[in-house]
Curated annotation (Swiss-Prot):
The gene is RPL12. CDD domains: Ribosomal_L7_L12. The keyword Ribosomal protein applies. Residues 1-11 have a biased composition (Polar residues). It comes from Nicotiana tabacum (Common tobacco). This is Large ribosomal subunit protein bL12c. Its main location: plastid.
Length: 186
């Protein structure tokens, strides 16, 4: 890095006029000289880089891209279906995670829905004014002792019955709700 040297002179604060008594004696100038470096301003050149999207494409590709971007959604869907048939590919072969995330997208194979046969009765909440009635309902529906029934309704939500039939779950829900508890069937 090249720099330019220059000097600066500092003079003494003493008066520059000599007194009459020292007129014959030459008075030496008190001066100090220090080199000063002045920084040379560097101009950096910026090079312009085109974004990747601005890469030139053949005229045929540009024309095709313009036509595709002007399609309506219905026409674009038809184009996708046509290209899938012509090329023998599916969108699922390119994005297997998308198919797992959206199982409704694969309409070709209807899913077999099995009807649930076993249900769980869950006590979600018991208001403080309905605790005694709920404990009585729990004891009537199960063979639990008073202490066990009381522990069951503390620290909710808890499963009250597991793996029971739909009728039995509905009956237990009805009795517990009549006692004042909030119940759900899972």
């Amino acid at each position: 890095m090249a720099s330019t040297l220059s000097t600066i002179t500092l003079r003494s604060p003493s008066p520059s006029t000599a007194s009459s008594t020292h007129a014959s004696i030459p008075f030496p100038k008190k001066a100090l000289e220090f080199p000063i470096r002045t920084p040379k301003l560097h101009h950096r050149r910026a090079t312009f880089l085109r974004p990747l999207a601005a890469v030139e494409a053949p005229e045929k590709v540009v024309q095709l891209g313009d036509e595709i971007s002007n399609l309506t959604l219905a026409d674009a869907q038809k184009l996708v279906e046509y290209l899938q048939d012509k090329l023998g590919v599916t969108a699922a072969s390119f994005a297997p995670a998308a198919v797992a995330a959206a199982p409704g997208a694969a309409a070709e194979a209807p899913a077999v829905v099995e009807e649930k046969t076993e249900f769980d009765v869950v006590i979600d909440e018991v208001p403080s004014n309905a605790r005694i009635a709920t404990i009585k309902a729990v004891r009537a529906l199960t063979s639990l002792a008073l202490k066990e029934a009381k522990e069951l309704i503390e620290g909710l939500p808890k499963k009250f019955k597991e793996g029971v039939s739909k009728d039995e779950a509905e009956d237990a829900k009805k009795q517990l709700e009549e006692a004042g508890a909030k119940v759900s069937i899972a």
